[in-house]
């Protein structure tokens, strides 16, 4: 294979190169290498990573996500919305509500269609996992990490840990513009307490239904948005008594807004945009 067709899409500026594996079938042994290549802003297309839209024996489509460092992720909220848009618009599905398989399990997506195009997608992200063993954290166990003080070098932060199929640690901050992403993000991501690494979020509370959010993503660094991170931030806000279950929480990310609702049935709903940037052929 010397080339393949791709579609670049983004959810609130969190951009990936999407490859339709129903048609292209990139070789398994080269996926990490290709993800690194296409993600480069200098010698590739430029993105936060690569997402494959694959056949599935459990759902109409399966999503596989590769970060820009070549590592494979388990889940991606912004990616799910874009996969849903792609699947509907390219007639991989016919219904407006359908399942998508991920490495974290099955999720349900519902697309809002206008003139044949999808602009807004709601995804049922499932139930958050809160125990240290589920995150995972090194000390394991069934305890939760809620409003817990942790030391990272000489810096102490108070955080809440949430898994949305991938691990997150959420820290409150008084001024989101002062979030120490570049200095503490890579340190916390690779802290030995988190054996699989972790996504790092700083959150400023405006009120019980409005949060400002910045993220350092595991394997990608600073990004414009993180859908699972926004879900984790809303869940953490509820766990810390700031927000309530079963209410819409608007999360302001660098790339735009997501609406998150942690329902009484335990499921977290995420609603936001998905956009196509361009299509083309990539030469290997």
From Swiss-Prot:
Cellular compartments annotated: Cytoplasm
Primary residence: cytoplasm
GO MF annotations, alphabetized: diaminopimelate epimerase activity
Pathway the protein acts in: Amino-acid biosynthesis; L-lysine biosynthesis via DAP pathway; DL-2,6-diaminopimelate from LL-2,6-diaminopimelate: step 1/1
Leading EC class: isomerase
Active site (record annotation): 76 (proton donor), 226 (proton acceptor)
Signal peptide: none
Catalytic activity from the UniProt record: (2S,6S)-2,6-diaminopimelate = meso-2,6-diaminopimelate
Site (Could be important to modulate the pK values of the two catalytic cysteine residues) residue list: 168, 217
GO CC annotations on file: cytosol
Coiled-coil region list: none
Gene Ontology terms describing biological process: lysine biosynthetic process via diaminopimelate
InterPro entries: DAP_epimerase_AS, DAP_epimerase_DapF
Record SUPFAM superfamilies: Diaminopimelate epimerase-like
Keywords in alphabetical order: Amino-acid biosynthesis, Cytoplasm, Isomerase, Lysine biosynthesis
Keyword Magnesium attributed: no
Superkingdom of origin organism: Bacteria
Keyword Isomerase included in the entry's annotation: yes
Record EC number: 5.1.1.7
Family per similarity comment: Belongs to the diaminopimelate epimerase family.
Quaternary state and interactors: Homodimer.
Entry-linked PANTHER family: DIAMINOPIMELATE EPIMERASE, DIAMINOPIMELATE EPIMERASE, CHLOROPLASTIC
UniProt function note: Catalyzes the stereoinversion of LL-2,6-diaminopimelate (L,L-DAP) to meso-diaminopimelate (meso-DAP), a precursor of L-lysine and an essential component of the bacterial peptidoglycan.
Listed NCBIfam families: DapF
Protein name from the UniProt record: Diaminopimelate epimerase
